[in-house]
Amino acid sequence: MAVLVLAGCTSTDGGGRGEGTRAEGDRPAGSGPYWVNPRTSAARQVTAYVRDGERENADLIRRIAGRPVGEWIVPEDPEASVAGVTGAAEKAGRQAVLVLYNIPHRDCGQFSKGGAADGDAYREWLEGVARGIGDRRATVVLEPDALLHLVDGCTPEEFHEERYDLLKGAVERLKRQPGARVYVDAGNAGWQTPDALREPLRRAGVEEADGFAVNVSNFQTTEASTDFGRRLSAEVGGKPFVIDTSRNGNGPYDGGDPALDWCNPPGRALGEPPTTDTGDPLVDAYLWVKRPGESDGDCRGGPKAGEWWPRYALELARASD
């Protein structure tokens, strides 16, 4: 069942705005080519802890605040949002990681429900995203869960053709931007099998994309994700892939209600820092697509999906020792 492996994918952090960004000091050691937004909720939390004299907690949250994370582009004014982020990244000599999560009928009405009102609204929004990228460099993760919700039947059949058309069209439009690298979301190692994804990925435009993304907002280990990605790559012409390692340090959770294994599970840890130095020619990058410390949804005492949750952020950072 898809509910076992979905994750709350929205971000209410203001990701995608880039106001007040700095050109210097934004890249920690090991971040590779990716830009660190100094205005994330994690960064603000560090400031608050320092102000309140909570030095130990501040040091823990710096493990998140000092890393590049995905910028989840808000529905409102996408051109300005994306231009702000990619422009700030360019000034710092880096590139932004953009996450597009606005597909109509998103998340099957679950914790992260929403999305564009219809296909035309989505295309208009996507056009704004593309204009905002311009000729700057950006790594784009395209629509987490959107394809998998077609494969598992969560999305009603009447919306399938339109969604395939929107995904393929998004790949084609974004690839007109010379600096954009586009990865179609392909679920995770605990969801669907590679052979079940071959034709859906083809219909979604993976051949025109730079590759696909695995483990977005999930907890599968890097080893399991790499194995899954390699097998899936063999099904789609050897395409490379990126892995979301943001919270996979301790692997997936297998305690309590299986239907909530994906939602704010306890005892998880930060994973490998973002980098393009993966040691595997098929793995283009480890990314922190999900922003560690943001809730998966209102489960296990957490706030709504995408909201910053200091307690969970501290647990993730502390478990990474």
Predicted regions and their residues:
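Surface-exposed substrate-engagement region within the catalytic domains
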Residues: 41-64, 189-310
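N-terminal carbohydrate-binding/catalytic regions of secreted carbohydrate-active enzymes
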Residues: 29-132, 136, 291-316
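Sec-dependent N-terminal signal peptides
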Residues: 1-2
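Active-site cleft segment of glycoside hydrolase catalytic domains centered on the general acid/base Glu
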Residues: 115-135, 144-180
